């Protein structure tokens, strides 16, 4: 049921943030795809942070990357469905739900950025590499992944905040 306090378009104005995430994501992927060769590393902060180029045909942490290609379309379908749900959710938000609107817009922008890669390129371009002393590496990721993660953390925090505010006060 639509939220009457949302107005006609709800919080769809926050789609500018999704577009900004998408543009920055695609611009950085294009830059690193052209500037680096596969798995080349440029150390930015020794022992902690590097630029690299990696292609991920799977999902997070290369989940199902060894599939025969069907996973590309499965993850694309999931991204399309999730994106549609996020737009509807964003539209139904009230004016006072800015935190949630930002969270949804970040997740949406990231999902569309990776969806574009998956459909057009057949893989997601990753280029950010965080590591500890060249021994312990976190899987490479990109701006879209970062936006999705920040948005998901914001959603979780919002759920905890909402749940806490609904708890009855005990004397």
UniProtKB/Swiss-Prot annotation:
Compartments reported by the entry: Cell inner membrane
Any single biological process term in GO: proteolysis
Active-site residue numbers: 126, 145
Keywords of this entry: Aspartyl protease, Cell inner membrane, Cell membrane, Hydrolase, Membrane, Protease, Transmembrane, Transmembrane helix
Cellular component, GO annotation: plasma membrane
Pathway: Protein modification; lipoprotein biosynthesis (signal peptide cleavage)
Alphabetized GO MF terms: aspartic-type endopeptidase activity
Enzyme Commission code: 3.4.23.36
Catalytic activity reported: Release of signal peptides from bacterial membrane prolipoproteins. Hydrolyzes -Xaa-Yaa-Zaa-|-(S,diacylglyceryl)Cys-, in which Xaa is hydrophobic (preferably Leu), and Yaa (Ala or Ser) and Zaa (Gly or Ala) have small, neutral side chains
Primary role: This protein specifically catalyzes the removal of signal peptides from prolipoproteins.
PANTHER family: LIPOPROTEIN SIGNAL PEPTIDASE
Protein name per Swiss-Prot or TrEMBL: Lipoprotein signal peptidase
Organism (species): Pseudomonas putida (strain ATCC 47054 / DSM 6125 / CFBP 8728 / NCIMB 11950 / KT2440)
């Amino acid at each position: 049921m639509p939220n009457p306090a949302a107005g006609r378009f709800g919080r769809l104005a926050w789609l500018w943030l999704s577009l900004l995430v998408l543009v920055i994501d695609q611009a950085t992927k294009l830059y690193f795809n052209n500037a680096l060769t596969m798995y080349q590393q440029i150390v930015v902060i020794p022992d902690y942070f590097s630029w690299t180029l990696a292609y991920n045909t799977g999902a997070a942490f290369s989940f199902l990357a060894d599939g025969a290609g069907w996973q590309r379309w499965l993850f694309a379908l999931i991204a399309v469905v999730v994106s549609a749900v996020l737009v509807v959710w964003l539209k139904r938000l009230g004016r006072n739900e800015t935190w949630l609107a930002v969270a949804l817009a970040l997740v949406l922008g990231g999902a569309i950025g990776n969806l574009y890669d998956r459909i057009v390129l057949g893989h997601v371009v990753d280029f950010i590499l965080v590591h500890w002393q060249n021994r312990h590496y976190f899987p490479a990721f990109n701006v879209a992944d970062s936006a999705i993660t920040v948005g998901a953390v914001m959603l979780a925090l919002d759920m905890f905040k909402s749940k806490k505010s609904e708890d009855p006060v005990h004397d």
